[in-house]
Amino acid sequence: MGSGGVVHCRCAKCFCYPTKRRIRRRPRNLTILSLPEDVLFHILKWLSVEDILAVRAVHSQLKDLVDNHASVWACASFQELWPSPGNLKLFERAAEKGNFEAAVKLGIAYLYNEGLSVSDEARAEVNGLKASRFFSLAERLNVGAAPFIWLFIRPPWSVSGSCCKAVVHESLRAECQLQRTHKASILHCLGRVLSLFEDEEKQQQAHDLFEEAAHQGCLTSSYLLWESDRRTDVSDPGRCLHSFRKLRDYAAKGCWEAQLSLAKACANANQLGLEVRASSEIVCQLFQASQAVSKQQVFSVQKGLNDTMRYILIDWLVEVATMKDFTSLCLHLTVECVDRYLRRRLVPRYRLQLLGIACMVICTRFISKEILTIREAVWLTDNTYKYEDLVRMMGEIVSALEGKIRVPTVVDYKEVLLTLVPVELRTQHLCSFLCELSLLHTSLSAYAPARLAAAALLLARLTHGQTQPWTTQLWDLTGFSYEDLIPCVLSLHKKCFHDDAPKDYRQVSLTAVKQRFEDKRYGEISQEEVLSYSQLCAALGVTQDSPDPPTFLSTGEIHAFLSSPSGRRTKRKRENSLQEDRGSFVTTPTAELSSQEETLLGSFLDWSLDCCSGYEGDQESEGEKEGDVTAPSGILDVTVVYLNPEQHCCQESSDEEACPEDKGPQDPQALALDTQIPATPGPKPLVRTSREPGKDVTTSGYSSVSTASPTSSVDGGLGALPQPTSVLSLDSDSHTQPCHHQARKSCLQCRPPSPPESSVPQQQVKRINLCIHSEEEDMNLGLVRL
């Protein structure tokens, strides 16, 4: 009863129970330490070694995980980190815990005496023993790839004094004699090294090592023994059949070279007792197992790289391969290594050329008898990079690719097809031409290498008017029908023959592949007329729904990403501004000289290359890296820019010591004659640098190489060597005005030789590049050098 005699009920409206107070529990603080130990391992794996050390210092629990678990160190990343006295303990600890990258880099660092300074006394012996230890460890950690460490210690060896390569070889051999396990791959590497000597005794030793390695289970050694015994087995049908069975066994176990040889052996199926259907199935399995790996992933990793930049790099590599007469397989493997590395690791634009030439050094050592030495590779880049830069890049590449150098290429499948099917020589050359053109275009990587090789053969046979371009036999061998190949054929034709190639600043297309196949060895096949798009559609029996595909790069501007070095300065200035130059420049050498220069130089260029090749020029094991290669190489001004003629600035060659009387205005007629000279077949200009309007910049192009008087350089003959060049790129700003300046002619190009005014001998004058630019412009420049 309430007040006033009012009765209240117990409803919720009249009566309220006191509410219960809910006590909020304080949430438990969860940190990274609360995660299970297995999850922490996955987080710590693949971190860089610097990050692992930083995490280790955070908490005692993390410190225990890092210190007591080998898997953390085995998976640690040493990307862009090189052994030095300060971090040597980290590298050694990681290598001993099973880190492949650390072991490879330590072996290379000791072999080339790079980063780890060792006293000159007994340096080869000390470094050789240490390099042997880590190379052996790297080979034991090598999983799924053929033995590879032999490519670092292969001949030529030094003939004077102690040789670090020889010390490594002997140390590895002694290790194999002491240890019973994990020595099959080491024995194979020792055999590969000895097999490259011409001495019969060493050849026999190599054969014995291969036999021992094969007995220990090395599949690659077993295949090499089969290859050496193949010639003798052919004479006896019984032995031939036994040899074929062994080859089939090696192929089934995964040896790529054995798989290729097995497919080629099916050409003699009757002698082997195989039915046509069985032999076709063997080849078909090889072709159908080929998988496409899109190279467009490169551009998702390399944000500053585009298809045109890659085109220029590959075009330059083709020129190097042509100059050094490397095989198509070597070229294709080099490009594959470049693309695989670009998909895995970020590469600044100014290091693209370094990556390309380092991949070529590795691939020539792995598959060729004639190699590209480190010193010669540095020379080919016009000394843009140093000896140690290339050595370190080799370590980065091998570790990033996990020692796997040999991969299937378009050339492999093409060779199988040309072995199994009778094809005219002209058609073979055209097929090879198409396969190398495919290297330049990443969009063609959407097709598997086997399909691309089949499409190249079909297009070649169509071009040469074959009545049955794709027979039933080819269908059975490859598993690709005529209709399956039509899209690939159309894409291949469009990219190779319709789309315009990037052009340099003189609107000269970059056509290194075409020039390569203008040689008589290939029947000058690149000069033949090809089918038009409409003719190809008619030959394929498909309707042409649209007009001929439009070309790209025909108009508009493509910003330059490569640049020549800014002038030849003194050695001290070059060393002081090394990082500045590396961030802005790249050059390339010219491959050929004019007839006048060849007459003057005689065999000097050959002598220069001889001095830069082989072990005596390389001095790799001795660590003699000081000094620059004296022979200057020309610079490829491969500029990918469409120039408006009104904005084109006059460009002429210049020397470091220009003559004062040449400072006046240049004769317009002489300039016109100079700019009309056709490009030489050597490497083309790769890069341009931006400059401010009105600034005087002197440059040299191919005209300076092809028309310079051989006797007008300096007394001697060195001045007529291939000359570096530089080029200019237009500013992207819409308000950029045409540049007007007084260009002066090169003393080497225009002036006859004059006697010295005094008895003091004149200093050697070298062709230079002068590119005046601002710091802001440097940030927008990328490079590639040949």
Swiss-Prot record:
Family, per entry: Belongs to the cyclin family. Cyclin AB subfamily.
Entry note about domains: The nuclear localization signals mediate the localization to the nucleus and are required for CCNB1 localization to the nucleus.
Cellular location(s): Nucleus; Cytoplasm, Perinuclear region; Cytoplasm, Cytoskeleton, Microtubule organizing center, Centrosome, Centriole
Native species: Homo sapiens (Human)
Protein's name according to its UniProt entry: Cyclin-F
Motif mapping: D box 3: 349-352
Post-translational modification: Degraded when the spindle assembly checkpoint is activated during the G2-M transition. Degradation depends on the C-terminal PEST sequence.
Keywords assigned by UniProt, alphabetized: Amyotrophic lateral sclerosis, Cell cycle, Cell division, Cyclin, Cytoplasm, Cytoskeleton, Disease variant, Mitosis, Neurodegeneration, Nucleus, Phosphoprotein, Ubl conjugation, Ubl conjugation pathway
Annotated F-box domain residues: 29-76
Effect of I772T: In FTDALS5; uncertain significance; impaired degradation by the ubiquitin proteasome system (UPS)
Consequence when changing S509P: In FTDALS5; uncertain significance; impaired degradation by the ubiquitin proteasome system (UPS)
Record annotation: effect of changing K97R: In FTDALS5; uncertain significance; impaired degradation by the ubiquitin proteasome system (UPS)
GO MF annotation, one: anaphase-promoting complex binding
This protein's encoding gene: CCNF
Region Disordered, residue ranges: 564-593, 675-738
More info: Founding member of the F-box domain protein family, which obtained its name from cyclin-F.
Short motif Nuclear localization signal 2, span: 568-574
Motif placement: D box 4: 351-354
Chain spans, region PEST: 582-766
Residue window of motif Nuclear localization signal 1: 20-28
